[in-house]
């Protein structure tokens, strides 16, 4: 599959979707994107910058949601203009899609909306690549139905069906907890869509701090290594210059000054894993 200006798939090096959870300010966004660009260019990792203009799904109604659509999209357009990077953001309702798609290179659907058929259809008809997140409540094999919905809508609109990615971000395991079943990454390959692993939301503790979500960022490297060892087309990781001061999802954000070391390890592992065919393909 061609994404932005690079090929993605199990026969390609993993690509990275990374950035702050939410757009907090223009300067921090440009600085963070610039640093990530430097790291990824050094390691030859294809890179898409992500950040949200609005966090519609918050634990508390008093939580920071963002700078608003117009300002958030303006700042993301500056990332494209100043740094020459492709950008991704999430959309939360059908009426947002057209405006967002006019700015960003890739759309993302929130995990909680993966079963909303009209919403998935509308995203697919935008003409943009779409990173479709698997709901925390969904079995991995059920993602085939979700991807098929997107492809059907694209085909009916006369658009390419080869624009959709399936993203794993953990599954609910009791109250305020998520776990990652690495088998799901192999199962989701049956969608014939590139599989992406969200290593930071997978360590989230939803609502774990009462009015906000907690997280265990120390396990991001553990799960990221496991996902790369399993074999994925891409990785999704949120980062922040100072996670303790992040306005959203700080507890599960990778410190920006540790991203280089983490990615260096993951690149080495990815190269080793993809050197040979995946044995599981021949076991049945």
From Swiss-Prot:
It comes from Burkholderia cenocepacia (strain ATCC BAA-245 / DSM 16553 / LMG 16656 / NCTC 13227 / J2315 / CF5610). GO terms for cellular component: cytoplasm. It is an enzyme of class 2 (transferase). The lineage of its organism: Bacteria, Pseudomonadati, Pseudomonadota, Betaproteobacteria, Burkholderiales. Its EC number is 2.5.1.55. Keywords: Cytoplasm, Lipopolysaccharide biosynthesis, Transferase. Its main location: cytoplasm. Disulfide bonds: none annotated. This is 2-dehydro-3-deoxyphosphooctonate aldolase. GO terms for biological process: keto-3-deoxy-D-manno-octulosonic acid biosynthetic process. NCBIfam families: KDO8P_synth, PRK05198.1. Pfam families: DAHP_synth_1. Transmembrane segments: none annotated.
């Amino acid at each position: 599959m061609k994404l932005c200006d690079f090929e993605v798939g199990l026969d390609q090096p993993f690509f990275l979707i990374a950035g702050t959870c939410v757009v907090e300010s223009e300067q921090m966004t440009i600085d963070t994107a610039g640093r990530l660009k430097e790291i990824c260019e050094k390691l030859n990792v294809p890179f898409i910058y992500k950040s949200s203009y609005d966090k519609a799904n918050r634990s508390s109604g008093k939580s920071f949601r963002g700078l608003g659509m117009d300002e958030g999209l303006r700042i993301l357009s500056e990332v494209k203009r100043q740094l020459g990077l492709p950008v991704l953001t999430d959309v939360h309702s059908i009426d947002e899609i057209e405006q967002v798609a006019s700015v960003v290179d890739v759309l993302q659907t929130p995990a909680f909306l993966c079963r909303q058929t009209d919403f998935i259809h509308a995203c697919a008809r935008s003409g943009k690549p779409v990173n479709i997140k698997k709901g925390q409540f969904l079995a991995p094999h059920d993602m085939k139905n979700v991807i098929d919905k997107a492809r059907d809508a694209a085909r009916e609109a006369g658009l390419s069906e080869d624009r959709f990615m399936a993203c794993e971000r953990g599954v609910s395991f009791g109250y305020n907890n998520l776990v990652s079943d690495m088998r799901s990454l192999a199962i989701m390959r049956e969608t014939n869509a590139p599989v992406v692993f969200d290593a930071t939301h997978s360590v989230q503790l939803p609502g774990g701090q009462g009015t906000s979500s907690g997280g265990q960022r120390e396990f991001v490297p553990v799960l990221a290594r496991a996902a790369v060892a399993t074999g994925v087309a891409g990785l999704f990781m949120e980062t922040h210059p100072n996670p303790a001061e992040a306005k959203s999802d700080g507890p599960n954000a990778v410190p920006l000054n540790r991203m280089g070391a983490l990615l260096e390890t993951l690149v080495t592992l990815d190269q080793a894993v993809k050197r040979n065919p995946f044995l599981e393909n021949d076991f049945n």
